[in-house]
């Protein structure tokens, strides 16, 4: 059919208006849609501009930002976005790469990079597109004419262009200067007239361009030029160019702009990490007569009268006391350069430096208090007597009130109903400030901040410091994401040195900067003035001149925190210590027992906290942790809010996504690009879309959290993963010896912390912060680290240690390999990981190191003989199966099965002196690298408790000992009356399946030692199987004995042929199953072995003769396959001929037994499919509104089926639920099914790479 034929046949009256009418209508529809979306976008963002008025773009190919983001930007700033290219209407083509054919086709068109749009928005006006052209005819050696473009006054938009008129770009970008002088460092100067013409529009009105960028309200600087270390330079610093530095900062970005504040001191309250809280407003000052200034260190008070030093005096002389008015009796000061030499400051080389630093570090105190409070809660739970004084008071109060209401016949129905699960979130209001002013009535109701500086907020500019360039570096780093910004080395001598000049362009400058002492906490009155936690004190003083500063009082903070937790502990011990001023409490049990409402309980707790501490607390309550935390936001300050289940949907829809845990700046930006700003918007996105954008786990988390679903429990105990000590404040070394001495001192600090935690560590990490090449020698913050590179080295020790000598030695070795410039070191840290409790290793290690092993033996051979004498004479050998499975298939990557000997009877008894908390990884001196903490699955079959030697059990390493004790605990619940499960030869016939890659390890019975040899050499394992950690822990004489034994065995001739190795050689041996056998087994057994064991349908067929034929081959893989075929077949095994040889395969088959059978997947106890169907039908038909706990239980049952590879039953269950739930009249059941199905599909996708087809 020729082109256009169908159109002619359609006729002119079809509504399209002739040829091309369809596309014209489509394009018009897209334009109308763009205009309508623009209006919606303007209402949502709250601002707009006309920067791109008259500009119509067409995006060709992949761009960064994406086409959707560029479309959104054009909506906001007055441009047009064309889905289809039009030569007559499209003004600019946006692309990052084009093929040669496209280049020729678009010859003469304006093809520019997407940076043109982004940087035009940053500049606040339409920039010239020429520097951003994707391709140009100008050769690389051809020079261009540097004419300055002329901008009309009406082109300038309110925004950064009125402050820094234009910024030089690396690629010779020529922009409008508007008579402003471009300084060498790229920051434009401006005069008083220009600012008056702009009607005072500066950084304070940047929110007109980006509405969500909250500003602190500082007026722009007037009548000054930017100080470049006090003097001018002739070289433009391209690595730290500033055209991106003047972008309006959001609240989150602004709170993190600091050119390297101290990590331990420079964070806001409750330990929130804010390393770069240097906002753009800190580049300005409201007074036009004040020169551009920064504060790289603490300031000195103008008052000359000084008082005694406060207990919180900071190291390096950064915190001194002077009298400063009635509201601040102490002040932080930093000496001027002329006085610095005369002041005694603490140095890292001083022996008391580390202790002084941590004694005055706020964040160190906060983290330490959290550990102490967590241990306090744990100790209460261990010593729980069941008596709660607070709860008893509530009962009495409730009884009295009920008696009064009974007289009037007005009993509360809500209090008599059984409450559902309820979590309470207790958060103190402005904790540091509240504690500081509780005895200061003169400060109540006034703007107050807790900080180390109480002066005027200014300090002298130190030589060598360059705050502007540090600010530019952090600004660019945040704006460009993780992109590394290169700082040329050659700038060292040109830019960073020679800061003695106090002139710039011939103008004298006041070398004072704003104080960079950070505010740890501020009152709500101060927050109303724009001050926030983490802001620099100098900037805060500009915002609020009446701001009153108070000093730290760590003893008072600790006292109040302990009081708060004691109050909570008087009601319940189900407490999770979040911080010194924050806690999560499970109050379900309290509400059930006292019959109070959540509001009544919260009110009682808040009143008691206020009465005892004189500080207020806010309380949020909800059915889970997420809702409780969100309710607290609404309750603050000094209030309480109970988010009821029926209010959750309406409440959470209006919440910003930034209020959800785990959503930071990066994720917020990505969600915004998808048009998602609130939880209501997020609910419209499917789980598949979220998982595609953010990954399976994060996508599922967002999907659940935006609906108010959170199954995280209140955790009272948290396993400690590491112990560390890091310092990045005041670190300055001049000689290698100083650094080495400091590392040794830090190792001693690590030892103290390990001993306090009762831990030993096996993995050491050394972290060093080194000044970045080209960065200022002196950072903007006094004593801070500045712009640095982070270097780390890690080593794994042979055995866990808490010795400062061992840690120091290994640390020095790693330090020497780094080959660093000592003078550039700015931070040092040591971290210890792979922790093991000291109490769990002391008994075994002390016995080994002293040469006295359990049972009074003095060597490994004696230990083995002692064990043999204590066991039954029928015991002939042990076998250990270590099965390794690919880690990519499952996290349960290894399975270790220890089979008991012949004649060992399994019982359910467990000796009372066996501790549940112990763990181990060794067996009779044989080391296994498998650790419970690495989440490996260990299944161990052990002898009965009556046959167990206590001394041997105590000598076992912690991980293996814990596994043995866990199996004994499981055996307590098992019964052995069933004849089908009667032990054979003292062994239970159940055996876990052995996965691919099985290795057979024989531990034969020890022969009597040969008198001529003096030691049984054959009983030793192969030298390659000896664990270095075990060997290193032996005493010196025992090591020598073992070395002699190995040397002696090497001299003995081989007496056994290779083919008789299995049956006659009693030495330890490893046999690997062949790939051929694996393939055959897989073909014969398409059903998973695990499912074969655990399926309840298969349990009835265990006695079938067809399934109990003995294995005819002696190979390990066939032997294991034979075990799987003979579960419970006692009669068949009796008919199998066996030899007297202990290593004969048929004889071994009678001993392959297990005492542990994992529980089959069940739904509330229902295992069979018919039972599950009945339970599901009853659940769906009798309940109109399903509970979250029930839905999660169904999800767990389905995921258990996936783990058991019972996909057939899973398919039936899902389809049955779909029929029932979709036939229900209640729409909530449809939502419940979608939620269940989404979770099941996620697990299936992760496990099998595919999903379930539900029709």
UniProtKB/Swiss-Prot annotation:
Mg(2+) 2 binds at residue 427. Mg(2+) binds at residues 427, 581. Residues 1156-1255 are annotated as: Protein interaction domain. This is DNA repair protein REV1. Residues 357-367, 664-667, 720-728 are annotated as: Interaction with target DNA. The C-terminal domain is necessary for protein interactions. DCTP binds at residues 362, 427-431, 521-527, 533, 581. CDD domains: BRCT_Rev1, PolY_Rev1, Rev1_C, Rev1_UBM2. It comes from Gallus gallus.
């Amino acid at each position: 059919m020729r082109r256009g034929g169908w159109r002619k046949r359609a006729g002119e009256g079809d509504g399209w208006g002739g040829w091309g009418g369809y596309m014209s209508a489509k394009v018009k529809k897209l334009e109308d849609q763009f205009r309508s979306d623009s209006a919606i976008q303007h209402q949502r963002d709250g601002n707009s501009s006309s920067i791109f008025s008259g500009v119509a773009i067409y995006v060709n190919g992949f761009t960064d930002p994406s086409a959707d983001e560029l479309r959104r930007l054009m909506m906001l700033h007055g441009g047009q976005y064309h889905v289809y290219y039009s030569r007559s209407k499209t003004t600019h083509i946006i692309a990052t790469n084009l093929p040669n054919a496209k280049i020729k086709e678009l010859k003469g068109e304006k093809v520019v990079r997407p940076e043109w749009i982004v940087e035009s928005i940053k500049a606040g006006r339409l920039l010239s597109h020429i520097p951003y052209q994707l391709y140009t005819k100008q050769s690389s050696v051809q020079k261009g004419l540097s004419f300055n473009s002329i901008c009309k006054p009406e082109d300038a938009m309110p925004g950064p262009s009125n402050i820094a008129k234009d910024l030089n770009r690396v690629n010779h970008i020529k922009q409008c200067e508007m008579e402003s002088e471009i300084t060498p460092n790229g920051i434009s100067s401006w005069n008083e007239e220009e600012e008056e013409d702009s009607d005072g529009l500066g950084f304070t009105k940047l929110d007109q361009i980006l509405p969500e960028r909250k500003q602190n309200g500082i007026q722009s600087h007037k009548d000054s030029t930017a100080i470049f270390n006090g003097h001018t330079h002739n070289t433009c610093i391209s690595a730290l160019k500033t055209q991106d530095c003047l972008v309006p900062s959001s609240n989150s970005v602004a709170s993190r702009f600091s050119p390297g504040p101290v990590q331990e001191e420079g964070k806001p309250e409750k330990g929130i990490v804010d390393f770069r809280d240097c906002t753009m407003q800190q580049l300005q000052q409201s007074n036009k007569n004040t020169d551009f200034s920064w504060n790289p260190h603490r300031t000195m008070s103008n008052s000359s009268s000084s008082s005694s030093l406060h207990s919180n005096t900071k190291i390096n002389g950064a915190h001194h006391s002077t009298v400063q008015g009635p509201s601040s009796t102490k002040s932080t000061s930093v000496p001027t350069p002329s006085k610095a030499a005369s002041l005694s400051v603490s140095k890292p080389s001083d022996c008391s430096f580390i202790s002084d630093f941590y004694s005055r570090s706020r964040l160190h105190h906060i983290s330490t208090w959290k550990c102490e409070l967590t241990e306090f809660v744990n100790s209460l739970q261990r010593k729980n007597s069941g008596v709660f004084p607070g709860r008893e008071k509530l009962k009495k109060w409730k009884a009295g009130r009920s008696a009064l209401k009974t007289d009037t016949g007005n009993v509360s129905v809500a209090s008599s109903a059984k409450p559902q699960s309820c979590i309470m979130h207790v958060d103190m209001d402005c904790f540091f400030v509240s504690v500081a002013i509780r005895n200061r009535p003169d400060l109540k109701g006034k703007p107050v901040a807790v900080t180390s500086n109480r002066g005027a907020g200014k300090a002298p500019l130190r030589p060598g410091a360059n705050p502007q360039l540090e600010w530019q570096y952090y600004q660019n780093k945040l704006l460009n994401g993780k992109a590394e910004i290169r700082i040329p080395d050659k700038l060292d001598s040109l830019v960073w040195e020679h800061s003695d000049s106090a002139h710039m362009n011939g103008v004298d400058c006041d070398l004072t900067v704003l104080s960079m002492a950070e505010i740890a906490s501020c009152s709500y009155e101060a927050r109303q003035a724009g001050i926030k936690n983490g802001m620099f004190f100098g900037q805060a003083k500009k915002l609020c001149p009446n701001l009153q500063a108070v000093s730290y009082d760590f003893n008072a903070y600790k006292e109040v925190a302990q009081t708060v937790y004691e109050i909570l502990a008087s009601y319940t011990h189900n407490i999770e210590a979040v911080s010194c001023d924050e806690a999560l409490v499970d109050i379900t049990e309290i509400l059930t027992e006292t019959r109070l409402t959540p509001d009544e309980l919260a009110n009682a707790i808040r009143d008691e906290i206020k009465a005892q501490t004189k500080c207020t607390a806010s309380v949020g309550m909800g059915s889970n942790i997420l809702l409780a935390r969100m309710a607290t936001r609404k309750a603050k300050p000094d209030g309480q809010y109970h988010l009821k289940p029926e209010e959750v949907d309406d409440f959470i829809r209006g919440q910003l996504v930034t209020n959800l845990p785990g959503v930071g700046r990066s994720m917020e930006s990505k969600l915004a690009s998808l048009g998602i700003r609130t939880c209501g918007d997020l609910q419209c996105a499917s789980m598949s879309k979220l998982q595609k954008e953010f990954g399976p786990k994060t996508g599922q988390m967002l999907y659940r959290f935006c609906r108010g679903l959170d199954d995280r429990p209140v955790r009272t105990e948290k396993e400690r993963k590491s112990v560390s000590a890091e310092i990045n404040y005041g670190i300055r070394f001049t000689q290698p010896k100083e650094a080495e001495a400091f590392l040794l001192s830090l190792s001693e600090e690590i030892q103290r912390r390990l001993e306090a935690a009762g831990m030993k560590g096996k993995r050491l990490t050394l972290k060093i912060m080194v000044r970045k090449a080209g960065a200022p020698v002196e950072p903007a913050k006094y004593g801070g680290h500045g712009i640095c590179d982070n270097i780390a080295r890690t080593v794994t020790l042979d055995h866990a240690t808490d010795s400062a000598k061992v840690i120091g030695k290994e640390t020095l070795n790693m330090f020497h390999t780094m080959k660093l410039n000592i003078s550039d070191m700015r931070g040092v840290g040591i971290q210890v990981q792979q922790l093991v409790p000291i109490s769990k290793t002391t008994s075994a290690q002390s016995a080994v190191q002293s040469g006295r092993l359990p049972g009074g033996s003095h060597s490994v051979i004696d230990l083995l003989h002692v064990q043999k004498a204590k066991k039954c004479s029928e015991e002939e050998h042990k076998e250990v199966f270590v099965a390794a499975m690919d880690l990519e298939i499952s996290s349960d990557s290894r399975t270790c099965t220890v089979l008991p000997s012949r004649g060992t009877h399994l019982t359910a008894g467990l000796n009372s002196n066996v501790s549940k908390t112990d763990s181990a990884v060794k067996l009779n001196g044989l080391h296994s690298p498998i650790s419970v903490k690495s989440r490996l699955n260990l299944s161990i079959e052990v002898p009965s408790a009556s046959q167990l030697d206590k001394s041997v059990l105590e000598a076992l390493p912690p991980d293996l000992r814990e596994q043995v004790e866990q199996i004994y605990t499981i055996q307590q619940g098992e019964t052995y009356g069933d004849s089908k499960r009667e032990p054979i030869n003292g062994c239970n016939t159940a055996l876990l399946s052995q996965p691919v890659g099985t290795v057979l390890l024989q531990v034969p019975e020890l022969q009597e030692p040969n008198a001529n040899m003096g030691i049984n050499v054959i009983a030793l394992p192969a030298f390659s199987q000896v664990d270095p950690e075990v060997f290193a822990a032996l005493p010196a004489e025992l090591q020598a004995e073992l070395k002699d034994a190995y040397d002696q065995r090497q001299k003995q001739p081989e007496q056994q042929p290779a083919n008789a190795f299995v049956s006659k050689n009693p030495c330890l041996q490893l046999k690997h199953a062949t790939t051929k056998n694996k393939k055959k087994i897989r073909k014969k057994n398409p059903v998973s072995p695990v499912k074969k064991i655990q399926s309840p349908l298969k349990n009835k067929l265990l006695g079938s003769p067809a399934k109990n034929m003995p294995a005819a081959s002696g190979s390990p893989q066939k032997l294991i396959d034979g075990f799987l075929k003979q579960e419970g077949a006692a009669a068949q095994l009796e008919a199998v001929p066996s030899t007297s040889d202990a290593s004969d395969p048929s004889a071994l088959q009678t001993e392959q037994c297990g005492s542990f059978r994992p529980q089959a997947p069940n739904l509330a106890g229902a295992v069979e499919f018919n039972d599950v169907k009945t339970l599901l039908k009853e659940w769906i038909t009798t309940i109109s509104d399903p509970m979250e706990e029930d839905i999660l239980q169904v999800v767990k049952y389905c995921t258990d089926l996936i783990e058991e590879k019972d996909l057939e039953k899973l398919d039936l269950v899902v389809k049955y639920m779909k029929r029932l739930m979709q036939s229900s009249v209640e729409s909530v059941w449809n939502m419940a099914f979608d939620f269940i199905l989404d979770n099941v599909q996620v697990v299936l996708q992760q496990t099998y790479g595919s999903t379930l087809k539900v029709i």
